[in-house]
Structures are given as C-alpha cells and as structure tokens.
Regions:
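Internal maturation/activation junctions in enzymes
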Residues: 1-2, 14-74, 127, 151-157, ...
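Short connector loops/turns at beta-strand edges and beta->alpha or beta->beta junctions
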Residues: 13-15, 85-86
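Catalytic alpha/beta core of large soluble enzyme barrels
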Residues: 69-197
C-alpha cells in the first residue's frame, strides 16, 4: 500500500526557529528534516515487512509499502492543527480574514504574535497596520531593529510573506526536497501580476 508522509507547517517551523525562508539555513533545515523523514519511513516500512511480509508488488524489496513520502497541500489540516502554515508553502499573510460557515475570523501568525508580545508591540494598532499592508510587516518601523533566533536574524526577514520571498528559493528548496520524496510534490509559486510570462 502506498503512503504519503509529508510535512505540515514548514514556514511556521522556520519562523519559530528564527530562520528566514530564503537562504542557506532554510536549505540546510530542508535537507536535514526531509532526509530524516526518508530514513525513518524506510526503516518503519522494513520493520513492517519483517512482521507482516512483503506484498506481492514489493517482493524482493524488503519494504511493506510501494511509496512512502509525498508533499501535499494541507490548508484544512493547518487550520485544525492550530493555525500553522500549510504544508511547505510560506504564509500568504501574517494576518488575514477568513470566512467560514461559522462567520468571519481574523487569523494571526502566532509566531509573529509571540515576537510582538516579547517586544511590547502586540497592539491593535500594529495588527491594523499589518492588515492594511496586506499582511506584510515590512512597513512597521518599530520592527526595524528587532532580531531573533540563534543567528540574530532581522524579524523582517523571518516574517516575509509568500509574495515577498524570492520564488526561486521555493524552487531551490523543492529541488533539495525532491531527492527524499518518492511521489509528487505540490508546489505553488506567487508572481506579481505585472511579471512577464
């Protein structure tokens, strides 16, 4: 039976560690985590094959499963898991409104909320400005000198939104990730409307 193990909340994870989506640190984390997922999923499939045997279509492989890893969009799951980023995608905005059958809700990036709280900037005025700027924090002057993480990264680099991130970085990370994935990868890119075709 094929499986599709993947990740949920990649951008949230990077932000919680103070790692910008762009750069060598994020690429290192991509390689480290996805290689570990590959190692552990193959180990588990071999262990299951020892207990339950290899299915006919896996005969001679030592595995219980034909496929183990895939990257899928996980928007619904990310909401259920506590408002974390979907799958491998960056956050589209650090604050946004969401409409559902139960009403309209304001969703905030919880990691950013903690950073703002730690710097005594978690105010309605700041969130209003972020919302007015389409979810971006780049125009919040109070954050100009705020650093975070082990490498003292500027907060404005860590909390860039999907459209603010160089899209080539998403492609680079997908290339790193693909060598550890044995199924397809769903990857979205965001280009400005004025970008040439």
């Amino acid at each position: 039976r094929p499986l599709g193990l993947g990740v949920l909340g990649w951008h949230t994870y990077l932000q919680s560690k103070g790692i910008p989506f762009e750069g060598l640190s994020a690429q290192y984390e991509t390689r480290k985590i996805f290689s570990q997922i590959k190692i552990e999923s193959e180990r588990a499939s071999r262990a299951l094959a020892e207990v339950y045997g290899e299915p006919l279509w896996c005969n001679g492989t030592g595995f219980r499963n034909t496929h183990l890893r895939a990257i899928a969009p996980t928007v619904s799951n990310s909401k259920l898991a506590g408002n974390i980023s979907p799958g491998i995608e960056p956050w589209a905005a650090n604050v946004f409104t969401e409409q559902s059958a139960k009403g309209t809700f304001i969703r905030r990036n919880t990691v950013l909320e903690e950073v703002l709280e730690d710097n005594e900037l978690n105010t309605p005025e700041i969130w209003e400005q972020i919302l007015k700027d389409g979810g971006s924090i780049q125009n919040i002057e109070e954050l100009d000198d705020v650093l975070m993480g082990d490498w003292d990264e500027p907060v404005k680099n860590v909390f860039k939104t999907f459209k603010e991130i160089n899209q080539l970085e998403l492609v680079n990370q997908a290339g790193i990730r693909q060598q550890y994935i044995d199924q397809s990868v769903s990857l979205n890119l965001a280009f400005p409307s004025q970008a040439p075709p």
